[in-house]
UniProtKB/Swiss-Prot annotation:
Organism: Oryza sativa subsp. japonica
Keyword Acetylation applies: no
Family statement: Belongs to the TRAFAC class myosin-kinesin ATPase superfamily. Kinesin family. KIN-7 subfamily.
GO terms for cellular component: microtubule
Molecular function terms from GO: ATP binding; microtubule binding; microtubule motor activity
The keyword S-adenosyl-L-methionine belongs to this UniProt entry's keyword annotation: no
Stretches assigned to the Kinesin motor domain: 3-337
GO BP annotations, alphabetical order: microtubule-based movement
Low complexity bias locations: 12-27
Entry protein name: Kinesin-like protein KIN-7L
UniProt entry keywords in alphabetical sequence: ATP-binding, Coiled coil, Microtubule, Motor protein, Nucleotide-binding
Length: 642
């Protein structure tokens, strides 16, 4: 919230006062206004020892103050704010012939607030190098409660509308896009030529209407790639109000009388609006913005979204003391009005997202320095623990996959060894078959003939003794054939039918036969079978161990999952607690702001009460002095009588 800035300007006196003394106290008469410290005005009674009413404002200017000084003190900050996106309003209020139009428009040698503001807007916009501006101007007057466009000749009466996008606006009002201050000055000359002026007893060129010069300032970032920036749209209102009039002083009649009635009516409604806005929030009733077109158009500047400055002009002469007192009372009430000014932006989706991120970052910064730092540390620790558990879970998963591959390899090796064992058992032969095959191979000779398929030879069992003919004792006396016949029991065989056969040991024993049947390869096969069986047993044991290790890893993985879930729950709870703390902190700050506002309102009420008490005390003192003077006069009159 921001208070309206209020200043009072006394014009130079029109009576025969010395030129070197332009203060309000130089006007002569029984009552005069005195300026103290450029912030306080006091009504002095020359015949009373106690001063009268006293008023305090942000600034008080005497007749020697120039338009440039008033602009620099009161309005220049509004121009900078308007360029930055804030709405701004400056208007002059006071009785007729008190210097309002001179303050706002000025002259060729002493430009007023409007031309100074126009030039300052363009100068300030040029200083902002990172934004580009589009400026539109309009000029309107409120004459007899009718709105006229001063930039269009013979324009029809314009209505007032309101919408969520534009707020309160005048429909059909002409807006000119301008690029320089000189272009604006030409439009101002056109508007002044179409404005209503008239002559009264108090002012030769009296304003008969309220005028509002409006500048709409739009700006956007020059870097169009920065989509996060918003478009700023601000409205600057520079208002020259017509002065309040007393018919007895102005001598108005006919058209001037009608104009004066409408002027006084709109100013009275403006005073009612200011009076309502200056009251306490709980006691404030309906604010009559709609009772006048002036207050309807100025609604954003009166208790709304705008920075507002009011220049109250006053006449220092004693003849205008009551009008000046009314002006100062209006200014005192206006000083109690607060506005809520904020930057006017049109946000795109990207700009809105950027703004929300900035607000989140600001909330994080606000949380620093409070006990929420503990929660931040807890959240950070839980995040680290969760990260460690995730790394451990990944490591266990990798080990589990490695164990699974190892188990598959062992199972494959075990299957291959089992197949080898099965093949060996299927292809094994008996010892007798093995011995016969060896003997058969050894019986073959180079001159031996192939036996026919139907030829079957049988050999006597080795368990029986081999039968043979007795060897003759005297071999020398026996012929060869006779010897052969004797050896073969009288059988004589054709020698050509015989085949060469190798020699055999005669009558081998069973033990020797078994020894001759045994092969050197039989023992390594048994040893190989035993080795393979041992390998299978070892592989089975290793497979069982791997299964047990896998079960342990899966159990550890489940435990880590449960711990991870509990950490996530704790993190969510901590975040929820942090959100609650943020909400509580914001609520406490809001309550603190409300208490500060109440304290300020209470201080203002005490101040107003003190002023009213001082005023009442001054009135009582003045009444006492007058009564005492009357009594003294009566006594003197009685003594003078014979």
């Amino acid at each position: 919230m921001e208070k309206i800035s209020v200043a009072v300007r006394f014009r130079p006196p029109t009576t025969a006062a010395p030129a070197a003394d332009q203060s309000p106290s130089s006007t002569g008469g029984d009552r005069e206004w005195r300026v103290d410290d450029d912030t306080r005005i006091t009504l002095l009674h020359r015949s009373a020892p106690v001063p009268g009413a006293s008023f305090a404002f942000d600034h008080v200017f005497d007749g020697a103050a120039t338009n440039e000084r008033i602009y620099g003190v009161l309005v220049r900050s509004l121009i900078r704010a308007a360029v930055d996106g804030f709405n701004g309003t400056a208007f002059a209020y006071g009785q007729t012939s008190s210097g309002k139009t001179f303050t706002m428009n000025g002259s060729a040698d002493h430009p007023g607030i409007i031309p100074l503001a126009v030039r300052d807007v363009f100068d300030t916009a040029r200083e902002v190098s990172d934004r580009e501006f589009l400026i539109r101007v309009s000029y309107m007057e409120i004459y007899n409660e009718e709105i006229n466009d001063l930039l269009t000749l013979g324009s029809e009466k314009l209505p007032i509308h309101e919408s969520l996008e534009r707020g309160v606006y005048v429909s059909g009002l002409r807006e000119e896009i301008v690029n320089s201050a000189e272009q604006v000055f030409k439009l101002l000359e056109l508007g002044e030529a179409n404005r209503h002026f008239g002559e009264t007893n108090m002012n030769v060129r009296s304003s008969r209407s309220h005028t509002i010069f409006r500048m709409v300032i739009e700006s956007s970032a020059k870097n169009h790639m920065d989509s996060g920036d918003a478009i700023r749209v601000s409205v600057l209102n520079l208002v020259d109000l017509a002065g309040s009039e007393r018919i007895a002083k102005t001598g108005a009649g006919g058209v001037r009388l009608k104009e004066g009635k409408h002027i006084n009516k709109s100013l009275m409604i403006l005073g009612n609006v200011i009076n309502k806005l200056s009251e306490n929030g709980k006691q404030r009733g309906h604010i009559p913005y709609r009772d006048s077109k002036l207050t309807r158009i100025l609604q954003p500047a009166l208790g709304g979204n705008a920075k507002t400055s009011i220049i109250c002009t006053a006449a220092p002469e004693e003849i205008h003391v009551e009008e000046t007192r009314g002006t100062l009372q209006f200014a005192s009430r206006a000083k109690c009005v607060s506005n809520c000014a904020q930057v006017n932006e049109i946000l795109t989706d990207a700009a809105l997202l950027k703004r929300q991120k900035q607000e989140i970052e600001e909330l994080r910064k606000k949380l620093q320095g409070s006990h929420s730092e503990v929660l931040e540390q807890v959240i950070l620790k839980q995040r680290n623990d969760m990260h460690k558990s995730e790394l451990e879970r990944d490591r266990l998963a990798m080990e589990l996959d490695e164990e699974r591959r190892l188990r598959e390899t062992l199972e494959h090796r075990l299957a291959e060894q089992q197949k080898m064992l099965d093949g060996i058992s299927n292809t094994s032969i008996s010892p007798d078959q093995f011995t016969d095959s060896i003997q058969f191979e050894s019986l073959k000779t180079p001159t031996s003939k192939e036996r026919p398929a139907e030829f079957v030879a049988s050999r006597a069992n080795y368990s029986k003794d081999v039968e043979f003919s007795p060897i003759p004792e005297n071999l020398g006396t026996v012929a060869d054939e006779d010897l052969w016949m004797q050896l073969n029991k009288g059988c004589v065989t054709d020698l050509e039918m015989l085949e060469m056969t190798p020699g055999f040991k005669c009558a081998p024993s069973l033990a020797d036969d078994k020894a001759s049947v045994a092969t050197p390869d039989e023992e390594p096969i048994d040893a190989r079978c035993q080795r393979l069986e041992k390998d299978c047993t070892a592989d089975r044991q290793q497979l069982e161990d791997s299964k047990a290790w896998r079960a342990a890893l899966e159990e550890e993985r489940d435990t880590l999952k449960r711990e991870n879930s509990s950490l996530l729950d704790a993190l969510a709870k901590a975040r929820q607690d942090a959100d609650h703390l943020v909400a509580d902190r914001l609520e406490a700050l809001r309550e603190l702001d409300m208490e500060k506002s109440r304290m300020d309102e209470l201080k203002q009420e005490i101040k107003l009460f003190s002023q009213a008490f001082s005023l009442r005390q001054g009135q009582l003192t003045s009444l006492y002095t007058k009564s005492k003077a009357i009594v003294e006069n009566c006594k003197t009159s009685q003594l003078a009588l014979p």
